Amino acid sequence: MSGPALKKKRSHMMIHRAVEGEIEEAMAVLDGYNRNAESINGIAVKTLIDLWHDKVIAHADEEEASLYVEIKTAVPGMDATLLKLSRDHDLLRKLLVNLSTEYSTHRDYAEMSMINHTMLNILKIHSSDEMAMLSDCEENLST
């Protein structure tokens, strides 16, 4: 069973918005500093890696382990939507590996910024699609 905050569109949307805001703030630090400011950029990227891992991927893991399982059982016909949302999670996981590898090897901050912007765009599209799904099936989920 997934927690009640995941099943309710409004509370779930607030979870997504909060983490998107944290990521945008850390990205502003990375994008705003001179590319030669190694120590500040390094801290910003490490913060972003931790946010992506500890908040976004952990949240995705919980959705897949509980919410998506419950939706699949309670709301027939959602398989294609759930597959697309899970694919978004997979893309974020793969990009996080790329970001972490870039951080630990080359430290090309322009590349890391691009990866973060790509991840954020995927996350925003994912959030919108997930909220649409919850609008369609929220009343069928246990509270």
Language-model region placement:
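Small-residue-biased structural context
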Residues: 1-143
